[in-house]
């Protein structure tokens, strides 16, 4: 028989630090450079990235020796409900006894700074920068008026 996902419990202070409900939540809006503080950005703009996705956050955390969980949740300040803007990542910050799970990341801000610094180095981000060359090399139209169509100025027409 297949095992089910453990039932979520309501949060209480008596929960242990390794319970899923005590893990910290990270939404892509927290590290999005295009968001304002009012729209949910948590870090300074110079430390953020443009339009991160929860998949990119997952890719960074998977190599960072942290325990995390993906959830299909929508950020409450996000206006769009499209699938590309959905997603939340829960990260374990502390062990059962309250000690840090990973000494490199003592706070939630340190985890977000690490994620924001590593996302631009992902291969998916490096491939996107090469597309600007193809957009600029569009054919130019000839403005010499020797073509058909009888150039000249056209007025607004008669007012009726």
Curated annotation (Swiss-Prot):
<keyword id="KW-0733">Signal recognition particle</keyword>
<dbReference type="GO" id="GO:0005786">
    <property type="term" value="C:signal recognition particle, endoplasmic reticulum targeting"/>
</dbReference>
<dbReference type="InterPro" id="IPR036521">
    <property type="entry name" value="SRP19-like_sf"/>
</dbReference>
<keyword id="KW-0694">RNA-binding</keyword>
<protein>
    <recommendedName>
        <fullName>Signal recognition particle 19 kDa protein</fullName>
    </recommendedName>
</protein>
<dbReference type="GO" id="GO:0006617">
    <property type="term" value="P:SRP-dependent cotranslational protein targeting to membrane, signal sequence recognition"/>
</dbReference>
<dbReference type="GO" id="GO:0005730">
    <property type="term" value="C:nucleolus"/>
</dbReference>
<comment type="subunit">
    <text>Component of a signal recognition particle complex that consists of a 7SL RNA molecule of 300 nucleotides and six protein subunits: Srp72, Srp68, Srp54, Srp19, Srp14 and Srp9.</text>
</comment>
<feature type="region of interest" description="Disordered">
    <location>
        <begin position="122"/>
        <end position="160"/>
    </location>
</feature>
<dbReference type="Pfam" id="PF01922">
    <property type="entry name" value="SRP19"/>
</dbReference>
<keyword id="KW-0687">Ribonucleoprotein</keyword>
<feature type="compositionally biased region" description="Polar residues">
    <location>
        <begin position="123"/>
        <end position="143"/>
    </location>
</feature>
<comment type="similarity">
    <text>Belongs to the SRP19 family.</text>
</comment>
<keyword id="KW-0539">Nucleus</keyword>
<comment type="function">
    <text>Component of the signal recognition particle (SRP) complex, a ribonucleoprotein complex that mediates the cotranslational targeting of secretory and membrane proteins to the endoplasmic reticulum (ER). Binds directly to 7SL RNA. Mediates binding of Srp54 to the SRP complex.</text>
</comment>
<keyword id="KW-0963">Cytoplasm</keyword>
<dbReference type="GO" id="GO:0008312">
    <property type="term" value="F:7S RNA binding"/>
</dbReference>
<dbReference type="InterPro" id="IPR002778">
    <property type="entry name" value="Signal_recog_particle_SRP19"/>
</dbReference>
